[in-house]
Amino acid sequence: MATSASALLSPTTFSTAISHKNPNSISFHGLRPLRLGGSSSALPKLSTTGRKSSSAVVRAELSPSIVISLSTGLSLFLGRFVFFNFQRENVAKQGLPEQNGKTHFEAGDDRAKEYVSLLKSNDPIGFNIVDVLAWGSIGHIVAYYILATSSNGYDPSFFG
C-alpha cells in the first residue's frame, strides 16, 4: 500500500530482453509460429488507415467437433425417444426371414438362431448397442453433410 497514485496510473512497460523459449512465449498464426515478446517483424502488419473495406465479409466458422457431437446427440435422442416404437413395430410386422413357410432356424439352420446376449441392455425400453451404432452413424452422416455443404459456400438461408 506504499505505492503512489502516479505509479498506478503510469503506462506499463514490458521488457523485451527475455528470449528464452517457453510455451507461453510462442503463438501461432496458421502453421507459422509467432514469437510473443520478441521482434515485431514476426507479427502480421496491420494497416491503420481510416478507410473501410466494404468487400470484407465476416463469417462464423462451424467447429467440426461441436457439429458432430450435437448432430450425433440429437440423432441418438430422436432414435431413443421418438422413433423407437415405430422402428420396433415395423420389425415385428416384418418377422423373421422364411423359406418355404418356415424360418431358417426351423428349417434346420442352427446358425440362424438370434444372438440374444448382443441385444440385451439395461435400458428400460431396450435401446441396445445395435441401436446406438445405427443412430450414431446417422448422426455422423448428417454432421458431415452439414460440414461439407457449409465449407463449400452453400448457404441454404433457412431463416431469411
UniProtKB/Swiss-Prot annotation:
Tell me the PROSITE patterns matching this sequence.
Answer: PHOTOSYSTEM_I_PSAGK (PS01026)
- Keywords in alphabetical order: Chloroplast, Membrane, Photosynthesis, Photosystem I, Plastid, Transit peptide, Transmembrane, Transmembrane helix
What subcellular locations does the record give? Plastid, Chloroplast membrane
Q: How does it sit in the membrane?
A: Multi-pass membrane protein
Any single GO BP term = photosynthetic electron transport in photosystem I
| One Pfam family hit | PSI_PSAK
Q: Name one GO cellular component term.
A: chloroplast thylakoid membrane
Give the residue spans that cross the bilayer: 66-86, 129-149
InterPro entries in UniProt: PSI_PsaG (IPR017494), PSI_PsaG/PsaK (IPR000549), PSI_PsaG/PsaK_dom (IPR023618), PSI_PsaG/PsaK_pln (IPR016370)
Q: Does the keyword Transmembrane helix apply?
A: yes
Q: What is its main location?
A: plastid
Q: Does the keyword Chloroplast apply?
A: yes
Presequence boundaries: 1-60
State the family it belongs to. Belongs to the PsaG/PsaK family.
Its biological purpose is as follows:
Not yet known.
Q: What is this protein called?
A: Photosystem I reaction center subunit V, chloroplastic
**Which organism was this protein described from?**
Arabidopsis thaliana
